[in-house]
């Protein structure tokens, strides 16, 4: 299955139609559907707080890790902006895992852990980079992974 941001956001639109809101939290980041974990990438950029987390847009279980994206002006009311990162490249084909965000002037950088499955069946974690000039549309670096598995010390997990 090839993951893309467009495919993930379409899945969210379809699955959200079946979600019952009765017991959903009011003061917590929450996607329209799916699974979230590991809030990360918290930063202040262009007048808003941005928060990202690992997100599965296809089901309410841990799998298919993408990055979900929210913003807030007051840290109380959060707006959902869909998928920021999808595992759509060979170096992150098995998931876009946790990382962080850096606001540097007019650019917002996301550093994340790209996971790929090797020929030996093991999952390898490496550090990857994406950037945005508007805080919402991210482009992955042509130099990814910026810290590949080969450069990591023996026994490290990224």
Where on the chain are the PLM-derived regions?
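Beta-rich carbohydrate-recognition and catalytic domains
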Residues: 1-158
């Amino acid at each position: 299955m090839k993951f893309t941001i467009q495919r993930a956001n379409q899945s969210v639109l379809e699955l959200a139609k079946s979600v019952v809101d009765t017991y959903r939290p009011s003061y917590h980041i929450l996607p329209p559907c799916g699974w979230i974990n590991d809030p990360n990438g918290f930063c202040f950029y262009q007048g808003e707080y941005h928060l990202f987390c690992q997100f599965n847009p296809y089901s309410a279980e841990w799998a298919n890790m993408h990055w979900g994206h929210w913003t807030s002006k007051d840290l109380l009311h959060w707006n959902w902006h869909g998928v920021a990162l999808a595992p759509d490249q060979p170096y992150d084909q098995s998931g876009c895992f946790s990382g962080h965000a850096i606001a540097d002037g007019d650019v917002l950088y996301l550093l994340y852990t790209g996971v790929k499955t090797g020929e030996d069946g093991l999952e390898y974690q490496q550090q990857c980079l994406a950037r945005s000039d508007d805080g919402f549309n991210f482009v992955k670096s042509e130099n990814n992974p910026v810290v590949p598995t080969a450069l990591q010390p023996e026994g490290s997990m990224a």
